[in-house]
């Protein structure tokens, strides 16, 4: 009998040791894998940031991968021009050249989501439309309707994109717009640590899916598009995009789930802010702004303050960076700083510093 008990005790001890070893391993693995949750409203630059991580810290994009974006680039071109053609009617702008009415009808007749090629007569129609003085005036009034940020980038380079041997460049890929539906995870290794970056859809309809992502989040990276101070929401014509972004940020930083997560604020699209601030005045949309006009630095510092002031916890530091998600060198530099911040905070969490 004693022999049996001894065997049972040995087995129990072995099981206990196994459990303890597994728990230690789980804790070690949790420390080695850092979960970064990318949050922000639609079109703030989250997907572009993940693409940059793939370029900087991952496998990048092979020629085959690049070819996979060709169709999306074509669709973005049709989508952008169709948005402007619709806006021409809405804003009651006349075409500079009446021949472009026919070109507009041709482009309008296409279902952009089913576009797979970019050939004649569409190339000529697009080129002619983009050079039209009416369309250019319509482009200048883009804050009054929905137009992708990449419209000008693609439409000024139509001949390159329409070439028979066209393959998407990295910049084409970074600028292509495809709304994120569902949750995209991108894991990458850096200095023996696995970073798991999670991108969730920013449009309102996507936000109910976020709840699953809230466990064990090391850091939240919240993206704000600096250029959206004068724009309306995709989902609602009378709501300011930046006000929506502020409301979302306030909700996120007060969630109990994120009590122990560090918060990093990316004030993105600083390049677009620099262009826009020269003709669209911040004070017209945020009357409390009392800084100089046409001053991008003063404008972005004011926007940063607006977001930081939403933090109700004086103990919680909001780490912030001004970014341009389509600029690989800028993101390389910024993420190196972010990585150091996250690692330092993570070591403190595990009492290793």
Swiss-Prot record:
Pfam families: G-alpha. The keyword Transmembrane helix does not apply. A lipid is attached at residues 3-4 (S-palmitoyl cysteine). Keywords: GTP-binding, Lipoprotein, Magnesium, Metal-binding, Nucleotide-binding, Palmitate, Transducer. Residues 195-204 are annotated as: G3 motif. Residues 32-353 form the G-alpha domain. InterPro entries: Gprotein_alpha_Q (IPR000654), Gprotein_alpha_su (IPR001019), GproteinA_insert (IPR011025), P-loop_NTPase (IPR027417). PANTHER family: GTP-BINDING PROTEIN ALPHA SUBUNIT, GUANINE NUCLEOTIDE-BINDING PROTEIN G(Q) SUBUNIT ALPHA. G proteins are composed of 3 units; alpha, beta and gamma. The alpha chain contains the guanine nucleotide binding site. This is Guanine nucleotide-binding protein G(q) subunit alpha.
């Amino acid at each position: 009998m004693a022999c049996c008990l001894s065997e049972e005790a040995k087995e129990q001890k072995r099981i206990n040791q196994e459990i303890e070893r597994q728990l230690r391993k789980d804790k070690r693995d949790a420390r080695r894998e850092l979960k970064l949750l990318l949050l922000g409203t639609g079109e703030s630059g989250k997907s572009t940031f993940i693409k940059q991580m793939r370029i900087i810290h991952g496998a990048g994009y092979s020629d085959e991968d690049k070819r996979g974006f060709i169709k999306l680039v074509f669709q973005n071109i049709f989508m952008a021009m169709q948005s402007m053609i619709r806006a021409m009617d809405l804003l009651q702008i006349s075409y500079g050249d009446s021949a472009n009415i026919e070109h507009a009808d041709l482009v309008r007749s296409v279902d952009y989501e089913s576009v797979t090629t970019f050939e004649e007569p569409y190339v000529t129609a697009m080129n002619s439309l983009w050079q039209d003085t009416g369309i250019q005036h319509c482009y200048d009034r883009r804050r009054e309707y929905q137009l992708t940020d990449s419209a000008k980038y693609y439409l000024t380079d139509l001949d390159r994109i329409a070439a028979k041997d066209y393959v998407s460049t990295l910049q084409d890929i970074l600028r292509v717009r495809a709304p994120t539906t569902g949750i995209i995870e991108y894991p990458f290794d850096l200095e023996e640590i696995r970073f798991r970056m999670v991108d969730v859809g920013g449009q309102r309809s996507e936000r109910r899916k976020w709840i699953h992502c809230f466990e064990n989040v090391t850091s939240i990276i919240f993206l704000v598009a600096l250029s959206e101070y004068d724009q309306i929401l995709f989902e609602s014509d009378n709501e300011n995009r930046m006000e929506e972004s502020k409301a979302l940020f306030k909700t996120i930083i007060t969630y109990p789930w994120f009590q122990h997560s560090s918060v990093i604020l990316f004030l993105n699209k600083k390049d677009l802010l620099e262009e826009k601030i020269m003709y669209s005045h911040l004070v017209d949309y945020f009357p409390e702004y009392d800084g100089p006009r046409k001053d991008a630095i003063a404008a972005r510092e004011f926007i940063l303050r607006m977001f930081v002031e939403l933090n109700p916890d004086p103990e919680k530091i909001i780490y912030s960076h001004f970014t341009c998600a389509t600029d690989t060198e800028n993101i390389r530099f910024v993420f190196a700083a972010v990585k150091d911040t996250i690692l330092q905070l993570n070591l403190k969490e595990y009492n290793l510093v």
